Amino acid sequence: MALSLTNFRIEPVDGMLALLPNQPILQGCQVSSAQPTALNAGDIVTIDGTNAKQGIITVKKAAVTDTPLGIVLTDPIKTSFAALDRVSVIPVNCYCYKTANANITAGSKLQFTAEGKVAATSTASNGYIGIALTNATAADQLIIVQVQPGMEPAAAAA
């Protein structure tokens, strides 16, 4: 997070909560032991049922074909989370900032890219992360997303 020295506003970053200060967060999730790279704020994660431990929500970075659980929350102290680290996840019905991969119109249903950016696409059998609440007029702009994870239905057989 960047604090402006002239007007004392916090600059938004990918994976930071937006709009409501008291949103529920999934605290104490654990990064899967099978996660090959560290997770970062803003990464989209899914549940790892294969490597789960009893009573602990175990997460890994979501592939575009996974149904996501939520988004890794920005942490002002720790910037990345390795395997077996504890991590907080922004779940369904919360609002956060995400980086757009291209132009996005508010109201669009959002899928995500392998890089973790949001995209206004509807590719069959791919996961989606939520709804755009603000516009992006170019790639790499931050938008506000209402987290609504799910899966785009498979294409109908002809």
PLM segments and residue spans:
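Surface-exposed, low-hydrophobicity beta-strand/loop segments enriched in small/polar/acidic residues
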Residues: 1-158
